[in-house]
Amino acid sequence: MIKIITFTIVTSLTLALLGCASSKQPTFGLELSSDYYEFIQPDFARYVEASTQWLRENRSFIGEDKDIELLINSPFQLVPTEQTNKAALLVHGLGDSPFSFSDIAKSLVNNGYLVQVLLLPGHGSKPEDLLLPSYADWQHIVDHYTSLLTAQYDEVWLGGYSTGANLVTINAINNEEITGLLLFSPGFQTRTPYLEKLTPLIASVINWGYRTEETNFARYNSVPFNGVLAYSNSASIVREKLTNYKLSVPVYVAVSEADSIIDPDS
């Protein structure tokens, strides 16, 4: 979904400056809001249960097989066959779903890691729900389930794609208990940072950046500007922290040199 950020900002800039619409402000502490569900749970199993129930009742299903769509979009955990002291938490990107980490999660569990894959608030149900969360909600869920893992396992790796990579990097900078990072196309900075700076202005007056028919079971085709704003906030914060602090853990980074949106040199 990050790949449409530039398009949505450019096409909506004129309307934004005219102030032709108003945006619903995201609620801090979304897990306590009547608009959403309690995604902060005392353990991961109850989180998966609460998330799946929310999706079952609130997802705008695309096809006839609702069970498959629920499976694709729900957070999940993979447990290795033998007892382990190693764990990994994986976080998807803007507009995406836990399904994006299905292959990597299988590889990690086959190498002896307990693997947990999050569903970021606002995802998996319908694009309109991305009008609800803020960056703080996304960081809160990552920090919470990371803390549960570090309390139980000696070795904890965090992995993320795009926006998810920003969130786990921010946690690792502040968390001495993290063993290492797995970053896939980290969204530290786009190739058009001057357009990224306009996101707060546009998000304050326009709800939708790009809206179209939803045809993909595993990710949104449409994106509200509130979701783009949450990404932009994560990018600004991770850049600031990386300027002032150095990571002291191993970091694996995978990024395409030809990426049209993310700056591979950032």
Predicted regions and their residues:
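C-terminal motif of bacterial Sec signal peptides marking the signal peptidase cleavage site
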Residues: 18-19
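The alpha/beta-hydrolase serine catalytic core
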Residues: 34-67, 188-243, 257-258
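Short, surface-exposed "cap/lid" segments of acyl-processing enzymes
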Residues: 71-120
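Catalytic nucleophile-loop/oxyanion-hole region of alpha/beta-hydrolase
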Residues: 125-152, 157
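Gly/Ala-rich beta-loop-alpha elbow adjacent to hydrolase catalytic centers
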Residues: 160-164, 168
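A conserved short beta-strand
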Residues: 177-193
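Short beta-strand/loop motif that positions the catalytic acidic residue
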Residues: 247, 253-255, 259
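Conserved alpha/beta-hydrolase "acid-adjacent" motif
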Residues: 260-265
